[in-house]
Swiss-Prot record:
InterPro entries, alphabetized: DabA
Highest taxon in the source lineage: Bacteria
Binding site for Zn(2+): C460, D462, H719, C734
Subcellular location: Cell inner membrane
Disulfide bonding pattern of the chain: none
Assembly: Forms a complex with DabB.
Assigned keywords, A-Z: Cell inner membrane, Cell membrane, Membrane, Metal-binding, Transport, Zinc
Function as written in the Swiss-Prot or TrEMBL entry: Part of an energy-coupled inorganic carbon pump.
Name of the protein in its database record: Probable inorganic carbon transporter subunit DabA 2
Source organism of this protein record: Nitrobacter winogradskyi (strain ATCC 25391 / DSM 10237 / CIP 104748 / NCIMB 11846 / Nb-255)
Membrane topology: Peripheral membrane protein
Gene Ontology MF terms: zinc ion binding
Pfam family, one: DabA
Major site of localization recorded for this protein: membrane
Length: 1037
C-alpha cells in the first residue's frame, strides 16, 4: 500500500482536478433544465478564439457545414457587404502568394458546393506541385524518423488508453466509458432503478471501491481492479498511484485530467453541479465530487491497460509507449494509419497481415513502398481541389504558374482561413439580422397619460411571449410588458404534497425565503393551520399514490396511459383529468410568520414528537396521556424545569429509564433547546417581510416603466409547457424560474402587489396604484398557446363583470397565436382557421407520439431592452427576448445594470445553448429523442449507456435533417443615450467582457440623438440611420 498522502499532495490532487474540470460547464438535472453556454468557462477569451479551443476540448464542430450557409445566402439571410468586408480584412493576414488574389480565392471557396476541407490533412506541398504538373510520385526513400514527431504529438494529445487504441485498435477507451457509466448509474440513481449501489452514504469512491472489490464481473473480465485498490486508501491516493503507474509526471496532470474529464463531459458537468448544490437532497445523502469521478476512471483505465499488456503486449506506461514509437517507428506509422482509417483501401489488408506477423523489417519494407503512394494520393486529391477552386476564382493560369514554395504558401493560407470561415458566415448572417431589426424598430411614442388600457400584462421576456403579446395588443386595448419570468422575486417553494424545496429563480441565485403552498381552507390563525405547518416542516414526505393502490392497478393505469395518450390523446387527456384526484384550492404563505405563530408551531410539533416517543419507546398510547404530562415532559426536555416526571408515579417507569427517555427526546426526537432555535431559524425563512415585498414590487414596476396609468387588470403572466412523454419538458418551462413553470412566481408577485400595506408604502415612494387595480396571476402555456387565469376566487366582486371580456380577448389571442405557430410545426397546417389551429395545438401537447409539441426558443436572436413602443408595430416572429425598460426612470443606471447582469446574460446562455446544439447536435446537443432513455431520474442518455446528453434534442433545432434554428449570437439592443449606456456597460464588468469579446452583439439606440442606432463592431460604435417615427396610434377606452 502506498504511503498516506500528506496534506500538500492531497490538496494538489484536488486543486488540479478542480481546475481541470472547470472547463466543463455545470449540467443541472433534467427535471429543471437550465440553459447554459457549453463554452461558458471559456468566456474570458474572445469568441473566435474560444470556439477554436472548444472544438479541440469537446471534439466538436463549432459552425455548420458550408452548404447550410449557402442556402441561407440564397434566401437573403446573409449580408453580402459583411462577407466582402470580412474576407478583405482577413485576407491581409494570409501569406502573400504570387498571382493569388486572396479575396477572389476565398469568395470562390465559400461558393463551392461541397463541405470538404480546403486542405487535405497530411498533404505535402511538393506532392501537390508534382500532381499539378502531372509528375509521377517521388521515388525518394521514406525517412521514418521524420514521420515520428507528428505521430508522437497526436498520441501525446490522447489519454493513455486512447493512445493504445490508436495504435492497436483495442477499443479500451470505449470499454472504459461503458464500465464507468454503469458505476455512475448505480451510484447516482434517484430511486428509478430497483438496485442501487450499497454504502452510497460514504461517498462515490468509497462505495464504488467496496462494490468493485467483490464484483465477479471484473474477475470474469480478467480485470485486476482489486489489486489496484489494495494500494490506495481514498480517491486522492488512487489518482496519485495510477498516474505514477502510468508514468505521467505531475507537470502533465492538468492537461491529462482535462482530457479525461471532457471525454464524458455530461457526467462531469452533472457531478460538478451536484457537488456545488448544497441544498440538493441526493447530494446531501450520497456525496460525490470530481476527484471521485476522476479516480474511478483512472483506476478502471489502469486495469484495462494492465489486462491489455498481459494479453496483447501493449504498453501501460507513457514512457514505454514513447519507446515503442521510437524503436518500432515504421510499425507504429502503419498501425496508426490502419486504425485511424487514413489508409488506401487496397492496402488495408496487406498492412494488417504484415502487422500481425510482428516483423519489424517487413513493416519497414512495406512502409517504403506504401508511403509514397499514400502521399501521392493526398497530393492528387489536393491538386484536384485546387484546380476546382482556381477555376471558380478564374485563376487557373495563376495556379499553373506557382512554384513549389508558392504552393506551400497557398496551402498555408487556406489552412489559416479554414477555422475562420464559419465565423465569417456567422458575422454576415448577424449583419443581415441587424439590418433587418433596424428596419423594424421605430422611434417610440408614449401613450397619452390619461388613456387607461382595459388591461395590462406582464409577460416573461421569453421569445415565445412575443407572438401572443403582439396578438393580444391587436385584439383590444391591451398594454404588455416584458420582465424576467420570476418577476424579480427569488422563491424557495414547498408545493402542496411535495417533499422537498424547489428554487424558482435563475440558477445562479439561491433564494433566502421559503413560500409554502397550503389548502385554502386552512386559517393561519387556527390550530389546524399550526398543526399542518408543523407536520410539513418536520416530516417532508411526498405522497405519490395512496397506500391502498396496488402495483397491479398502477400498471393497468399506465397501460391505459400508453394506449390513450398515443391513439386518442385529446379525448383521453380530458377523461384522465376527470378521474384524477383534484388538487384543492390553495393559498401561498407569502408573509413572514409572527413570533407567536412560530412559537406555536414549534410547541405543537414538539408535543406531537413527545406523543410519538411515548408510543415508540415506552409503548404508552395517546389516550392514556393527558396534556399535563406532555407539557411536563416538554419543559424538562427543554431544561426549563427539573424532574422527576409523572411517568414514574402514573406509569411506573423506573428512574433510569425515565432519564434515558428524556435524553432520547432531546437527541432523537428534537425536543431540545438548541434544536428549537434551529427550527426557529427555519421558520424565519418562511415568507417575506413587508420591506422585502415593497422592494420587490417597486423594483419590478420601476424597471418596466409601469409607474402610472394602471389598468383595472394587471395580469402577471408566468409561462410553462405541458407535454407528455417528454424528458425535456422542463426545457420548455421558464429558465428564469430555474427550469420550472412561472406560475408560482406570478402568484407570489400578484399577492404582494395586491396587499394594501405594500401599496401604501409604494404611494409614499411615488407609485400610486388605484384601488380598483387588481394584479391577477396567469400562466401562458406555450405548448397550447392558452393563457390560464389563477386565484380567481380572490377576484373582487366588482371585477367579475369585466372577466368575460378579458377571457374573450385572451382566447382570441391564443387562437391567433396558434394559427401563426402551427404551420411552423406542421407545414400542412397553413390552411387551418385559428380555432382549428388551437385544437391542433392542444392535441399535440398531450400526444405521446409527438416528439416536437413546439419549437421552444428556436429562432431566438434578439434581446431588446427598451420600451414596448419600439417594437409594438413589428412582427418579430418569436425571435426576440423583449425586456421592458424606460431609461427615464433610471437616472443612476442601476436598473439597467440589473437587466444586463440578469436577463441579458441568461438570454446569452439560452442563445448559445441553441447555437451550439444546432452546429453539432451529436456532441453539443443531445441527438434524437427517438433514442433517449431517462437515466436515474436526473438525466437522459442515448441508448442504454452513453454520456449524459446535455444540450437540446435534434427535434428542437433541426427539421428533416436541416437546421431550423439559425445559429447567431445574441444581438442585444438597448434604448438609452449612448454615453449613459456606455457608463453602465463600463460598470458591469461581466457584460462588458461579453460585448468586447464578441459573445454578445450590442446596439444602442440613442433617444437624445434622434433615435440614432449605434452598432458595436470591431471594437467601436458605428452610426446608422436614425429610426423612423410610427404612425399615430389610436387609443380606445
Amino acid at each position: 500500500m502506498v504511503d498516506a498522502l500528506n496534506l500538500g499532495r492531497r490538496l494538489r490532487v484536488r486543486s488540479t482536478a478542480y481546475v481541470a474540470s472547470e472547463l466543463v460547464p455545470f449540467f443541472w438535472p433534467m427535471r429543471n433544465f437550465i440553459s447554459r453556454n457549453p463554452l461558458r468557462r471559456l468566456e474570458s477569451m474572445p469568441f473566435e478564439q474560444a470556439v477554436r479551443r472548444g472544438a479541440a476540448l469537446f471534439h466538436a464542430r463549432m459552425f455548420l457545414p458550408r452548404g447550410d450557409y449557402q442556402r441561407w445566402r440564397r434566401e437573403g439571410k446573409v449580408r453580402p457587404e459583411t462577407l466582402d468586408e470580412e474576407i478583405g480584412r482577413r485576407s491581409q493576414d494570409l501569406p502573400p502568394v504570387p498571382g493569388v488574389d486572396w479575396p477572389r480565392w476565398l469568395h470562390a471557396l465559400m461558393q463551392t458546393p461541397h463541405d470538404r476541407d480546403a486542405v487535405v490533412r497530411g498533404v505535402r506541398a511538393k506532392d501537390v506541385h508534382a500532381a499539378l504538373r502531372g509528375h509521377p510520385p517521388s521515388a525518394q526513400a521514406v525517412d521514418v524518423a521524420a514521420l515520428l514527431p507528428e505521430l508522437e504529438q497526436r498520441l501525446h494529445a490522447r489519454t493513455l488508453p486512447e493512445a493504445v487504441d490508436a495504435l492497436w485498435g483495442t477499443g479500451l477507451a470505449d470499454e472504459l466509458d461503458d464500465l464507468v457509466i454503469k458505476s455512475y448509474l448505480d451510484f447516482f440513481d434517484e430511486d428509478q432503478s430497483a438496485w442501487r449501489m450499497p454504502g452510497r452514504e460514504r461517498g462515490l469512491f468509497s462505495a464504488w471501491s467496496e462494490v468493485t472489490r467483490r464484483n465477479a464481473r471484473m474477475v470474469l473480465r480478467r480485470l485486476h481492479v482489486r489489486h489496484i485498490l489494495d494500494h490506495v486508501q481514498d480517491a486522492e491516493s488512487a489518482v496519485v498511484y495510477v498516474m505514477e503507474e502510468m508514468g505521467i509526471g505531475a507537470e502533465a496532470w492538468p492537461t491529462y485530467f482535462t482530457r479525461v474529464l471532457t471525454r464524458l463531459h455530461g457526467w462531469t458537468g452533472f457531478v460538478r453541479w451536484r457537488a456545488s448544490a448544497k441544498h440538493y437532497y441526493w447530494a446531501q445523502q450520497y456525496p460525490a465530487d470530481i476527484v471521485d469521478l476522476l479516480a474511478i476512471r483512472l483506476v478502471m483505465g489502469l486495469a484495462l491497460l494492465q489486462e491489455s499488456a498481459r494479453h496483447r503486449g501493449t504498453p501501460m506506461r507513457r514512457d514505454d509507449l514513447g519507446a515503442v514509437v521510437r524503436e518500432r517507428g515504421a510499425e507504429c506509422v502503419l498501425r496508426y494509419a490502419l486504425h485511424s482509417g487514413e489508409v488506401l483501401p487496397d492496402w488495408a489488408q496487406r498492412i494488417d497481415d504484415t502487422l500481425s506477423r510482428g516483423n519489424g523489417a517487413r513493416c519497414h519494407d512495406l512502409l517504403q513502398r506504401y508511403w509514397p503512394l499514400w502521399q501521392a494520393r493526398l497530393g492528387q486529391q489536393q491538386a484536384a481541389a485546387l484546380r476546382e477552386l482556381a477555376a471558380a476564382a478564374n485563376a487557373t493560369a495563376a495556379l499553373d504558374a506557382l512554384a513549389p514554395e508558392d504552393v506551400e504558401g497557398l496551402l498555408q493560407g487556406l489552412r489559416d482561413f479554414a477555422p475562420q470561415e464559419g465565423m465569417v458566415w456567422t458575422l454576415a448572417m448577424e449583419g443581415q439580422a441587424i439590418d433587418k431589426l433596424l428596419t423594424q424598430v421605430q422611434a417610440p411614442q408614449d401613450p397619452p397619460p390619461d388613456k387607461r388600457p382595459f388591461a395590462q400584462a406582464l409577460f416573461c421576456i421569453d421569445v415565445r411571449a412575443e407572438p401572443i403579446r403582439r396578438h393580444l395588443e391587436r385584439v383590444g386595448n391591451y398594454q404588455t410588458f416584458g420582465i424576467a419570468g420570476f418577476f424579480g422575486v427569488p422563491v424557495g417553494f414547498l408545493g402542496y404534497g411535495k417533499g422537498s424545496e424547489s428554487h424558482y429563480c435563475p440558477a445562479v441565485i439561491t433564494p433566502k425565503n421559503l413560500v409554502l403552498e397550503l389548502p385554502a381552507a386552512l386559517d393561519p390563525h387556527n390550530e389546524d393551520f399550526v398543526s399542518t405547518l408543523g407536520h410539513v416542516l418536520h416530516d417532508l414526505k411526498k405522497s405519490v399514490l395512496s397506500p391502498y393502490v396496488t402495483v397491479e392497478a398502477v400498471g393497468m393505469l399506465f397501460g391505459l396511459d400508453l394506449f390513450g395518450k398515443t391513439l386518442a390523446p385529446l379525448g383521453y387527456s380530458r377523461w384522465r383529468r376527470r378521474i384524477d384526484t383534484e388538487k384543492p384550492v390553495t393559498r401561498l404563505l407569502v408573509d413572514k410568520l409572527s413570533r407567536e405563530q412560530a412559537d406555536s408551531i414549534i410547541r405543537t410539533l414538539q408535543r406531537a414528537m413527545i406523543v410519538k416517543a411515548l408510543h415508540t419507546e415506552l409503548k404508552i398510547e395517546r389516550e392514556r396521556v393527558d396534556s399535563g404530562i406532555i407539557r411536563e415532559l416538554r419543559e424538562i426536555a427543554l431544561r426549563r424545569r427539573d424532574g422527576p416526571t409523572r411517568l414514574r408515579t402514573t406509569f411506573g417507569v423506573p428512574q433510569t429509564q425515565e432519564t434515558e427517555f428524556i435524553d432520547k427526546l432531546r437527541q432523537v426526537y428534537g425536543v431540545d433547546a438548541d434544536y428549537t432555535n434551529h427550527q426557529l431559524e427555519r421558520l424565519g425563512r418562511i415568507g417575506y417581510s413587508l420591506d422585502e415585498q415593497v422592494n420587490y414590487v417597486h423594483t419590478a414596476l420601476t424597471m418596466i416603466g409601469l409607474t402610472q396609468t394602471f389598468s383595472r387588470f394587471v395580469l402577471v403572466v408566468g409561462h410553462g409547457g405541458k407535454t407528455e412523454n417528454n424528458p425535456y419538458e422542463s426545457a420548455l418551462d421558464c429558465g428564469a424560474c430555474g427550469g420550472a413553470s412561472g406560475i408560482v412566481n406570478a402568484r407570489v408577485f400578484a399577492q404582494m402587489a395586491n396587499k394594501a400595506a405594500v401599496r401604501e408604502r409604494l404611494a409614499a415612494m411615488g407609485i400610486t396604484i388605484p384601488e380598483d387595480t387588481w394584479f391577477m396571476p396567469a400562466l401562458h402555456v406555450t405548448t397550447t398557446d392558452a393563457i390560464e387565469l389563477f386565484d380567481l376566487d380572490l377576484l373582487p366582486p366588482r371585477h367579475l363583470v369585466y372577466l368575460e371580456r378579458l377571457r374573450n380577448s385572451l382566447r382570441a389571442a391564443s387562437r391567433l397565436t396558434a394559427a401563426e405557430r402551427m404551420p411552423k410545426l406542421l407545414p400542412e397546417a397553413k390552411a387551418l382557421e385559428p380555432a382549428e389551429a388551437l385544437r391542433l395545438a392542444n392535441r399535440l401537447a398531450v400526444d405521446w407520439a409527438q416528439v416536437r409539441p413546439e419549437w421552444g426558443l428556436s429562432g431566438n436572436v434578439y434581446g431588446i431592452v427598451g420600451r414596448r413602443a419600439l417594437t409594438e408595430n413589428s412582427d418579430l416572429q418569436g425571435s426576440a427576448f423583449l425586456l421592458s425598460y424606460d431609461w427615464r426612470c433610471d437616472p443612476r443606471g442601476r436598473l439597467l445594470e440589473n437587466l444586463l447582469t440578469g436577463p441579458v446574460v441568461v438570454g446569452q446562455w439560452i442563445n448559445l445553448e441553441y447555437f451550439f446544439s444546432t452546429v453539432d447536435n451529436s456532441r453539443l446537443g443531445s441527438g434524437s429523442k427517438v433514442y433517449h432513455n431517462v437515466s436515474g431520474r436526473f438525466g437522459v442518455m442515448t441508448g442504454s449507456l452513453s454520456d449524459l446528453r446535455t444540450g437540446l434534442p435534434m427535434q428542437t433545432v433541426m427539421r428533416e435533417g436541416r437546421p431550423y434554428h439559425e445559429p447567431m449570437r445574441l444581438i442585444a439592443l438597448i434604448e438609452a443615450p449612448l454615453d449613459f449606456a456606455g457608463r453602465v456597460l463600463e460598470r458591469v464588468v461581466k457584460v462588458k467582457s461579453l460585448v468586447l469579446g464578441g459573445w454578445i452583439r450590442a446596439i444602442v439606440i440613442d433617444p437624445t440623438q434622434g433615435y440614432k442606432p449605434f452598432v458595436f463592431n470591431n471594437g467601436q460604435w458605428e452610426e446608422r440611420t436614425p429610426l423612423i417615427a410610427p404612425a399615430e396610434k389610436e387609443y380606445s377606452a
